[in-house]
């Protein structure tokens, strides 16, 4: 009945031109960001002798606090001016590049400078993520209106694939 119809409508968004590209990009972005959370703890918590950083739970917690604070600053301060200057269409790939750069830099942190390096990398990752979410939602809204597609269906499809990416 209704659930089946809702699922079919959401699934149909995965084949709708510009909308599907953003939805798939969102899925890949969320998947990568979720994997970072899991693997980051393994890397930082691994003993120095095994190639990790030997961090404890409190040290990891501080790094994740930096990610959270940087995300708040990004969405509370940076997103407005950058959106007006660049627009969502340019910010989406820029946000992927920024976040991707941060993710690539994580394994290159060196134990003797780990805290400073990880704080900088965490800020880079958080800024990229903080720019991605609003940009992708804004673009989806614009494309849905332009193509005359129900906004609820489009946003529901985006949230569905985001949830699926977190499960993977």
Identify the meaning behind each predicted range:
Residues 38-60:
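Short amphipathic helix-loop junctions that connect adjacent transmembrane helices
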Residues 15-40, 123:
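Pair of pore-lining "gating" transmembrane helices in MFS-fold secondary transporters
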Residues 147-168:
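A late C-terminal transmembrane helix in Major Facilitator Superfamily
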Residues 97-112:
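C-terminal ends and interior cores of transmembrane alpha-helices
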Residues 114-132:
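Hydrophobic core of transmembrane alpha-helices in multi-pass small-molecule transporters
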Residues 73-88:
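Helix-to-loop junctions at the C-terminal end of transmembrane segments
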Residues 1-24, 46, 50:
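Juxtamembrane intracellular "pre-TM" segments in multi-pass secondary transporters
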Residues 130-147:
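Intracellular juxtamembrane helix-capping segments at the cytosolic ends
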């Amino acid at each position: 009945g209704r659930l089946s119809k809702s699922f079919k409508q959401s699934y149909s968004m995965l084949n709708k031109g510009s909308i599907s590209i953003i939805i798939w990009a969102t899925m890949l972005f969320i998947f990568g960001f979720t994997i970072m959370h899991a693997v980051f703890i393994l890397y930082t918590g691994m003993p120095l002798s095994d190639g990790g950083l030997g961090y404890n739970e409190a040290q990891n917690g501080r790094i994740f606090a930096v990610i959270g604070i940087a995300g708040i600053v990004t969405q509370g301060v940076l997103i407005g001016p950058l959106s007006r200057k660049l627009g969502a269409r340019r910010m989406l790939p820029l946000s992927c590049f920024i976040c991707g750069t941060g993710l690539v830099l994580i394994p290159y942190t060196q134990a003797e400078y780990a805290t400073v390096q990880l704080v900088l990398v965490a800020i880079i990752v958080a800024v990229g993520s903080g720019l991605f979410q609003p940009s992708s939602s804004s673009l989806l809204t614009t494309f849905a209106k332009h193509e005359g597609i129900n906004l609820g269906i489009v946003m529901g499809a985006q949230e569905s694939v985001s949830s699926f990416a977190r499960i993977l």
